[in-house]
Each structure stands twice: as structure tokens, then as C-alpha cells.
């Protein structure tokens, strides 16, 4: 163990009190300098001059050039004075001890922590800062970059369904305890407006009317509640609307809405009346989704027993029922100018029907190898699918193409919705969280032609701009671009790079 001749160990507390802080720091600095000097003399095999390394010319300027890289050891001199020191103009003849004391004094004045090997650390930190300067700047720029979507909403209770308001920046979150939380969303922050206690059991579906005046909810308690958005009061209660738990609800216009329960019963309601307009039971299992087109002539229902059933609203009877499928029909959407109906299944398949011909599908796409439980149309030809794997995927309809991953959750996705402008998607998962995804980039997405070459494997794993994950190809593309830029600015690269 190396000891310094001037080092003294205090024998009692009085001697400790007599030691000045500057003296302690100065002594530590002297030890540091002597250890560094001995280290240099004992390790001659690492001498840069003997190794043939280039020695920087000393022009008398003690200031540090920020363009030097830490990858070269020739910039390191443990005995050199710190360039940031106010005493950098002192004569070098003062020796290592004086230099150490000066350095120690400077550390105390600058309120920096003292410690051995401080000078070398200062030089090293400076070099690291220089080398990672671009990275740090990029990180700061990413932090300061304006958000393109609202931040995540986290609840204590399980979120069963979500729905955007048609006119205002409000989203409704239904929970398993029967409450509905209304949030005002913004790219900077989300604000809880109110919590409405509507049901005694799980609220399974929540929808706004087309004009946004009323909020409709259905529940496991077999009731349908209509809440006025302005007064926040209950407008109408359909108590025991079904004999079984109600699973889904669909709003047709400002007055009409339809409901489906766990036993396969479908009912059509009018807000201006007390009772249902009609009731039909053509299925034996849970109604998974209800939908209509803009004309509101046909009401379509998918069910867990593998049927697509269509009802004629005006005639108040069943129009047609599809052939049975050996899988649950879980979701659906209308595309291509109301000419195509696409149905998602529990086996990850997508079935396409020509409008009006719902007896059997005209096309089938394998889709993804995971159950599809949710589907929302983003544009007339692009759908977003979600399910148990926690990924939201975009798919081009007719012809089918996997466009990539829109967003991710750590757990299965429970609900999915798109706002009225079609620019923002919200999704909730079994982790009791709601995440937002900006999908405005789909507006500029070109149409896909039939027989166009594509790589299905890469498409299924491709991350779109809204995704929180990046693509490996993007990283290597950036490297290639940087190399090309370097070659363009390097005259010594060859005649091919010269203008």
C-alpha cells in the first residue's frame, strides 16, 4: 500500500477539528498526482511514444479542442492543468503538488464533489460529452417534440368499453363496476370531467347518439340507461330491457338503437317510446356485434355460435342467415362504398361478403394467427384489427394486405374505437389502461392493386409511424444514409464522390 510522507492520521477528535477542508482536499489531490506519476513510470510498455502513436504538437495553448475524440489516448495527460481552471495560466514549474492543490481549491469553489482521479475524470467526462453530443441532442429533441396523441389513461377498475364523442374531445370509459368515466383528452394532458354511476353490474357497452346529446349504456344487469350529456342526469331507464345480460349496443341515428344479449335476442328501440319496436330471436348464443350501413335498412348481427344474421328493419323480420361457421364470428365492418362486409373470427380469419349477399362469403383471408375480437374501419379500404395478442394491426381490404402494427399493449385488447375525424384511435386492454394512436398518416396511403408483389412476413411485423416500436430496417437505413452523407462530404473518397 502506497503512503505519502506528509500524510498524518489524526489520533483524536481535536486533531480532526483542526484540519481545514481545503487542506484535506489538497492532500488528497497530492496523493492523486503522485499515484498517477508512479503509474506512468511503472508501465512503460504503454508509453505512446514507444508504441509509435502520434504525439500531438503543443502550441502552448492549454485550451481543449472540442473536436478531439476520446478514442485516441494521446489527448490524455494526467499532469496537465484543467482547461476550465481560472489558474490555467500558472507556471508549470509549480510542480504536481501545487497543481493538485490548485485543482482542489477550484473544486471547493465550484461546489463540485471532491475525490481522487478528479482531473482525469474531468477530461474523460468532457470527451464523453463531446462524443455523445449528437445522441444527447437527439434525446432532448425527442423529449421536447410535441406529442401527436394524448397520453395514456390509467384506471383502477377494469375497462369494458370505450367510445369517442362525435363532436367534442371527450371519451367515455365504461367499467366493470358499472360506472362511466368521461375524460376530456388533449395531446398534453387528459382531464376527468365526471364519473357517472349508471349500472349495478358491469357496463358492457357505451355509445353516444349521433348528435352527441345522449349517452347510452347497456349492462349485465339487463338494463339500458340513457343519460343527458348536458344535465348529467338520467333521461330514460329501460329496466329489464332483456331477459338475459345485454352484451352489445348499436346506435342507428339520434332516435333509434339496437341491443343484443347473451342468449341471441336482438331488439330495436326508439328513444321516443317506452318499449322495444320489435324483438327477434334467431340465435342461441351471445350477440357479439351489431351494425348497419348509412341507409339503415338492414341490421346485421354476428354471434358466438358462428352465424351472420341480417334483419330487415322495415319488415321487422329476418332477411337472411349465413351458413354456420365452426368458429365464433366476433366483429365486422363495412368497406368499399358499402359494397363489402368483412367479418373477423376467433381463428384470426377475415370473411368478405358482397353487400346484400350474406348467405356465404365471397372471399376469405387467413388474417393473423391470433383471435380477432375487434375491428374498426379507419378509411373506406383500411381496417384496424385487435385481439388477444395485444397488437393493433392495420389491414387493407380488397385486396387484403397486412399494412403493419399501429400500436401495442402488454395484455389482450378489450375495446377499440376511432374518433369522428378518423385521425385518432383509442384502445383499452386488460391492464386497465387506455392508449391513443395517431393514424392520420392513413389519409395519404395509396390504394393497393391486385397481383402486386409483397412480403407477407415483413408486412405482418412492420411497425407503422404510430407504433411505439421501431423497425430494424429503419435503423440500418439511417446508418446507410449517414455513410452516404459522409462520402458526399469526403473529397478523399475518390473521384466518384467529387462534384
UniProtKB/Swiss-Prot annotation:
Compositionally biased region (Acidic residues): 12-23, 31-48
Biased composition (Low complexity): 91-103
Keywords: Repeat, WD repeat
Region ranges (Disordered): 1-130, 480-499
Pfam short name (any one): WDR55
Transcription regulation is among the record's keywords: no
WD repeats: 154-193, 198-237, 241-279, 282-321, 324-363, 408-447
Family matches, as Gene3D superfamilies: YVTN repeat-like/Quinoprotein amine dehydrogenase
Composition bias type Polar residues, residue spans: 113-122
Keyword Repeat on entry: yes
One GO term of the biological process aspect: defense response to Gram-negative bacterium
InterPro entries recorded: WD40/YVTN_repeat-like_dom_sf, WD40_repeat_CS, WD40_repeat_dom_sf, WD40_rpt, WDR55_POC1
Family: Belongs to the WD repeat WDR55 family.
Protein name, as recorded: WD repeat-containing protein 55 homolog
Source species of the chain: Drosophila yakuba
Lineage of origin: Eukaryota, Metazoa, Ecdysozoa, Arthropoda, Hexapoda
